[in-house]
């Protein structure tokens, strides 16, 4: 595992072996595809996680892949183990709450996507990203696919890897800050989480650019992360 102090990104190295993708969206020259997806854009606490997964068409498929949001936590864990064991390459990037507050959640997600693709660029010739935006500066050609986590198997796998990685971390953070019950809501804005914020105030894992956290801090103006002035994220903007 490598860490970059400049962007607080954690990249998990690739596993070996492979699985199969039958994506209906072909890429030029049959290049290996990196599916890319994120988990944790909306929560009030914790990092945003971005994963990239590369499939090998010569290997058997993993059955049961789906958008991580459609799977139970137990099923996600089962599929995660299969993905990381048999993937040709995979990577996970975590951008923490401090960096999210510095550059905003959108730019943090774009940064995570770029770092995740860089983590599999030694095998991937093309990246397919869930959503409608492609970050600038990717190491290979890419396209955005709206609803890709329900359409493309590589993106489904990435969504599972990102979600499981982040959920595991939030359970670890619960041990450090049990008063917020991060193990239950994973940092999302549930009534119990909002009540804990009002009672205890925010901890270092909370995103201070998000309106409910700002209100808990007693700030008069509650701004969302998108309203907060931000520094450029390593030159990251949208690809033209």
UniProtKB/Swiss-Prot annotation:
Gene Ontology biological process terms in this record = DNA replication, removal of RNA primer; mismatch repair
Q: Gene3D superfamilies recorded for this chain?
A: Ribonuclease H-like superfamily/Ribonuclease H (3.30.420.10)
Q: Where is it located?
A: Cytoplasm
Cofactor note (record): Manganese or magnesium. Binds 1 divalent metal ion per monomer in the absence of substrate. May bind a second metal ion after substrate binding.
**Residues reported in the UniProt entry to bind a divalent metal cation:** 37-38, 130
Q: Kindly state which reaction or reactions the protein catalyses.
A: Endonucleolytic cleavage to 5'-phosphomonoester
Its protein name is Ribonuclease HII
Species name: Xanthomonas campestris pv. campestris (strain ATCC 33913 / DSM 3586 / NCPPB 528 / LMG 568 / P 25)
């Amino acid at each position: 595992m490598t860490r970059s102090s400049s962007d607080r990104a954690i990249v998990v190295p690739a596993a070996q072996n492979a699985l199969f993708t039958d994506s209906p969206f072909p890429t030029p020259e049959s290049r290996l595809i990196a599916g890319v997806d994120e988990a944790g854009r909306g929560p009030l606490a914790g990092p945003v996680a971005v994963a990239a997964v590369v499939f090998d068409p010569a290997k058997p498929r993993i059955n049961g892949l789906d958008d991580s949001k459609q799977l139970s936590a137990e099923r996600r864990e089962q599929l995660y183990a299969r993905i990381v064991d048999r993937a040709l390459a995979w990577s996970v990037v975590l951008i923490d709450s401090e960096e999210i507050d510095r550059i905003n959640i959108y730019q943090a997600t774009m940064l995570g996507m770029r770092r995740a693709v860089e983590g599999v660029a030694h095998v991937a010739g093309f990246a397919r990203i869930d959503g409608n935006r492609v970050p600038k500066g990717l190491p290979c050609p890419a396209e955005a696919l709206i609803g890709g986590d329900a359409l493309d198997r590589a993106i489904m796998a990435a969504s599972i890897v990102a979600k499981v990685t982040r959920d595991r971390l939030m359970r670890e953070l619960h041990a450090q800050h049990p008063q917020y019950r991060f193990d239950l809501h994973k940092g999302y804005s549930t009534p119990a989480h909002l009540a804990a914020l009002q009672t205890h105030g925010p901890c270092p894992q909370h995103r201070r650019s998000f309106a409910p956290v700002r209100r808990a801090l007693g700030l008069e103006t509650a701004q969302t992360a998108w309203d907060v002035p931000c520094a450029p994220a390593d030159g990251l903007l949208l690809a033209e």
